[in-house]
Structure formats: C-alpha cells, structure tokens
UniProtKB/Swiss-Prot annotation:
Its EC number is 2.5.1.7. Belongs to the EPSP synthase family. MurA subfamily. This is UDP-N-acetylglucosamine 1-carboxyvinyltransferase. GO terms for molecular function: UDP-N-acetylglucosamine 1-carboxyvinyltransferase activity. It comes from Wolbachia sp. subsp. Brugia malayi (strain TRS).
C-alpha cells in the first residue's frame, strides 16, 4: 500500500514549478496513433502510470513504443509510437480494466482495422461513466458491437460510414472516440453538441498533422474521411489541471508560486474561480505567478460543468481550499454523481462539510489537524495532499498510488518550494 506522509510546518510555499504535459491530452493522442501507418513522435509527455498503461496496451497489439529516458532514468518526456505492424486486435483485459482511456482505442481500431475486442474501461471510481454514447455512435456508423460479460467485441464490414451524430449530452470521451473513428471512415461525419475542451482541440491538431480532414465550429465538428494517415511530430499541451492544483497549493499555504510552461489562456476557466476566492494571478516572463491578494481565502459558490466552465477535475482540490476559507462555500457537482468521497477524509482533518445530493456545503474553519487518511481516486488524493499542507502535525495518506496516475513527481515539486512530503511503498 503506497503512503504519502505530509508534515505541516505552516510554511508558505515559495518557488517555481514546471507544469508537465496534459494527462487528458496524451492518452487520446496515444490511442489515435493507432490510426497512423507510420511512426509518431510526441514531446512534452508526462511520466505517469496511465501513460505506461496505455503504452502496454499498444505494445500488446503489436505496436512499438519507446518512452525515452535520460541517463538518470528520468523521462525526458518524448514518446515514439510505431503502429505500422499491428498483429493483434484484442486489447489486454487486465490492463484495460485499470484505465478509463483504454476505451478510446475502440474507435481507431474499428476505423483502421475493422475489428477490436476490449473490456469495459477502468480508471477512477467517481461514479457512473457509461460508454453507451460511444457504442451508439459507432453502431450508427456501421459497427456491430456485442457485449459478452465484461468484454466488448466490435466489428464492421468494409469501412465505417460517415453519419450525422448528435450527442444527447456533452461527453469528452464520446467526442474523442467518434472523431478518431471518423478520420478513416467513408464520407462525412458531423458531430453536434461536441465537447470542446483544450485537450480535444489538441487531439484534433494532432490528427490534422497526420493527415485528417477536420473542421470545428463551436460545438460542431465535421470530419471528412481520408484513405490513409501518416506520421508526425507533435508537442502535447500543458496540463491545466496540474497547474490549477499547484495554484491552489500557493493559495492554501499563503505562498507564491511561479507556474512555468502554462499560458493563462489555458487555465482561464480555473483562474476566474481562483481570483474569486482571493488569488492574485499575474503574468511574469512567460509564466503565471499565483499568490493571495491579502488576508484569508474567500468563500465561494461554484458549479462544475463542461468546458468552458469550472472543471470537475478541479472540484476536490477547490474543496480543500474552502475548508479554511472565511464563511460558507457551496460546490455543486454536475458531471459525476460520486465525486465527494474526499469529503469524508477532509472531515477527519476537522473540516466542516455537509453533503446533500450533488451539493457540498463547506463551513470554513481556522485550522485543520493531521490524521490518517485513505485516498479513493486521482483528484481526491491531490485534494488530500493540499489540505495536509496546512493540517497541524503529520498526515498520512494511504492508497496514494492514485496520485501518480495524473501527477508526475508532485512530492518533489512541492518539496522544492518548502513542503515536507515523503513517500513510502
């Protein structure tokens, strides 16, 4: 069982933190490399558990994957894939069941090879995350999809066919899967009510580089199928969720952090909320500087919604800040129905939180106290680390392996700015 030990010294975090490439961008782009018959070189790739899991899945199909490392065995953040000789069409069950993004391989596999076998995807336990919209859209495009227990067997006679598809609700994963499936389909596919997150725009940019014909107009995406896709070199966008998490670390500890490698436009929907709770967000020499304006953290009312609104992936971390804010804050979770598991753990630190359906009310208190905590998913682990930075004494976070699915070397980055965090197996 992996553990994180945080010793609070009430020290404001001060320093510089380099923001890595986006977890939510690299995974669909790695899946999209299946569409290419040539090698693909990706830069700014974060060294995360999920990236290694996706690499295993690609290699299991016959792809060559090289995640280059320096002499000290640390990743230099360049990954090369070669999917020119795929010889297996069954995605590894055990690995796929650990990784939500494994389902994004279905569209590319069907589009290029006409067949695929996979498992229902894994990932964080944050409530129902159905794949019915993915399946429905692929069936509309001509795929035959059968469910056999936990397995999904998909085939198509000939090529997938372009269709007009309207998503019943905005879905990042469904939008990505349909776009990838449509790139090698016959005819034109139009997606209405598509998600427009920066990570999707990065996927589209990558697909265009390898030869896809894609146009986007607000929430409408139009893909004209082509016969073949090639290789390219592409740099992954920076991780806005990682940036937002470290920004909150500065605010919670009343410190000052310089976030390098991220543009303000990348995190505007997050920065707006940070400014509302009393953060000062400044630009300096191409970086973003985060600190408190003055005094204490302000309470807020916020709802998570699809981009460009406040992201669900930042909700747990914001809740940690609200635990020590002035007044009562209300957070409404509109994306996932089971994303308040961190509230029980924050209460162990002394936080005053009440939950009613999809709303959490947080009555801010002056201080938190260290405790023995149990993490349940990626973002909740990050939230517990943030709260532990200002909890008196020592805090132990069990099941902390979740953190490495989305944050590269978080403890090292925070320690370089004054935190006292250690890791045990």
């Amino acid at each position: 069982m992996h553990k994180i030990l945080v010793r609070s010294n009430y020290k404001p975090l001060v320093g510089q933190i380099k923001i890595n490439g986006s977890k939510n961008a690299i995974l669909p782009i790695m899946a999209a490399s299946l569409l290419s018959s040539s090698s693909v070189v990706l830069h700014n790739v974060p060294d995360l558990i999920d990236v290694h899991l996706m690499s295993e899945l690609l290699e299991g199909l016959g792809a060559k994957v090289n995640f280059m490392h320096n002499k000290d065995h640390k990743a230099n953040h360049t990954l090369e894939t070669d999917c020119s000789n795929i010889n297996n069409y069954a995605i590894q069950y055990e690995t796929a069941s650990k990784l939500r993004a494994s389902f994004l391989m279905l569209g590319p596999m069907l589009s290029r090879f006409g067949k695929a076998r996979t498992a229902f995807p894994g990932g964080c336990n944050i409530g129902k995350r159905p794949v019915d919209m993915h399946i429905k859209a692929l069936e509309e495009m001509g795929a035959k999809i059968e469910i056999d227990g936990y397995n999904i067997i998909a085939t198509v006679k000939g090529k997938l066919q372009g269709r007009k598809i309207t998503l019943e609700k905005i879905s990042v994963g469904a939008t990505e899967n349909i776009i990838m499936a449509a790139t090698l389909a016959e005819g034109v596919t139009t997606i209405n009510n598509a998600a427009t997150e920066p990570e999707i725009l990065d996927l589209i940019e990558f697909l265009k580089k390898i030869g896809a014909d894609i146009k986007i107009n607000n929430t409408k995406v139009i893909i004209t199928g082509v016969k073949k896709l090639n290789g390219c070199i592409h740099k992954i966008i920076s991780d806005r969720i990682e940036a937002g998490t470290y920004a909150l670390a500065a605010i919670i500890t009343n410190g000052k952090l310089v976030l390098e490698g991220i543009n303000l436009s990348d995190i505007r929907c997050i920065a707006n909320e940070l400014e509302a709770i009393g953060a000062m967000v400044e630009l300096y020499d191409g970086s973003i500087v985060i600190s408190r304006k003055n005094g204490s953290i302000k309470s807020t009312n916020v709802a998570t919604d699809p981009y460009p609104n406040f992201p669900s992936d930042m909700q747990p971390q914001l809740m940690s800040a609200m635990c020590i804010a002035d007044g009562i804050s209300v957070i409404e979770e509109n994306i996932f129905e089971n994303r308040f598991s961190h509230a029980d753990e924050l209460r162990k630190l002394g936080a005053n939180i009440s939950i009613k359906k999809n709303k959490a009310a947080i009555n801010g208190i002056k201080s938190l106290s260290g405790a023995n905590l149990y993490a349940t998913d990626l973002r909740s682990t990050a939230a517990l680390v943030l709260a532990s930075l200002v909890a008196s004494g020592e805090t132990t976070i069990n099941n902390s392996h979740h953190l490495w699915r989305g944050y590269e070397a978080m403890h090292e980055k925070l320690n370089s700015c004054g935190a006292d965090i250690s890791i045990s197996p």
